[in-house]
């Protein structure tokens, strides 16, 4: 009689982590950063129909990389959760911190109890009444909440090069156009440094949205078309070392 194969719990966790990390690394990058007027989302995304950046609630936005079907189920679940909380209590009681904790618990349960972990990394952002109240939460595949950089979040492909570029170029209280140029330049960093990044930063391949502090009511707004073109860095800047633009998300499976 053949003996069943045995794998230690430590080995299972390592293999699940490796699977999730590889899936996330294949995804196109997303940058989320604070600027003077709120929070800016810039995602590499050539698909006009599948979104990596979305609204969750009045002041809360969502961005993700990895397997689309998995982070889309998280997005929908998050919307249902905050809608219920706002209905039962008060819309002002809904906040990004509580939602991030719910996502952390969900991802942790999936990672430890299911055969396959979610190949996703997500960011939950909330715009406050002033810049000091803006919040960014990055959640990894195992439910860990990472807040190593309070001013910006990078997810997906070549995060090291993009993070390094943002540390060089990011500054507080940037205007929207400046913040967009900084994000685009950072997304181009892997290709300019010789790393195998996608480097797709033309306006048609970027998904750009903001949480606009001054907007009445719901703060989330997408930036597309002529408005995006007018905010983009000049063409000579995009083709030079400081290049950049945003792009849209959604390669079907791995985003």
UniProtKB/Swiss-Prot annotation:
Any Pfam family hit: Proteasome
Pathway(s) annotated for this protein in UniProt: Protein degradation; proteasomal Pup-dependent pathway
GO molecular function, one term: threonine-type endopeptidase activity
Chief site of localization: cytoplasm
Single biological process term from Gene Ontology: proteasomal protein catabolic process
Biased composition, class Polar residues, residue ranges: 190-201
Means of activity regulation: The formation of the proteasomal ATPase ARC-20S proteasome complex, likely via the docking of the C-termini of ARC into the intersubunit pockets in the alpha-rings, may trigger opening of the gate for substrate entry. Interconversion between the open-gate and close-gate conformations leads to a dynamic regulation of the 20S proteasome proteolysis activity.
Chain spans, region Disordered: 190-255
SUPFAM superfamilies, per database record: N-terminal nucleophile aminohydrolases (Ntn hydrolases)
Cited function: Component of the proteasome core, a large protease complex with broad specificity involved in protein degradation.
Protein name in the entry: Proteasome subunit alpha
Annotated organism of origin: Saccharomonospora viridis (strain ATCC 15386 / DSM 43017 / JCM 3036 / CCUG 5913 / NBRC 12207 / NCIMB 9602 / P101) (Thermoactinomyces viridis)
Gene designation per UniProt: prcA
């Amino acid at each position: 009689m053949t003996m069943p194969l045995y794998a230690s719990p430590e080995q299972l966790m390592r293999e699940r982590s490796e699977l999730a990390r590889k899936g996330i690394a294949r995804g196109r990058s997303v940058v989320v950063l604070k600027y003077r007027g709120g929070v800016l989302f810039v995602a590499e995304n050539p698909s006009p129909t599948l979104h990596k950046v979305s609204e969750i609630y009045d002041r809360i936005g969502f961005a993700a990389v990895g397997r689309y079907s998995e982070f889309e189920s998280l997005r929908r679940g998050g919307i249902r959760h905050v809608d219920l909380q706002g209905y039962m209590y008060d819309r002002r009681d809904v906040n990004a911190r509580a939602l991030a904790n719910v996502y952390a618990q969900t991802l942790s349960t999936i990672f430890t109890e299911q055969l396959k972990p979610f190949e996703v990394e997500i960011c939950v952002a909330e715009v406050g009444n002033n810049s000091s109240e803006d919040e960014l939460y990055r959640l990894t595949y195992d439910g860990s909440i990472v807040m190593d950089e309070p001013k910006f979040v990078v997810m997906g492909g070549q995060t090291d090069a993009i993070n390094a570029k943002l540390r060089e170029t990011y500054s507080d209280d940037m205007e929207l156009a400046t913040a967009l140029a900084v994000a685009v330049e950072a997304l181009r960093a892997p290709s300019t440094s010789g790393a195998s990044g996608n480097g797709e930063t033309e306006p048609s391949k970027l998904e750009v949205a903001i949480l606009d502090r001054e907007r009445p009511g719901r703060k989330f707004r997408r930036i597309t078309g002529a408005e995006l073109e007018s905010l983009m860095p000049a063409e000579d800047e995009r083709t030079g070392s400081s290049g950049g633009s945003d792009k849209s998300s959604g390669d079907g499976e791995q985003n």
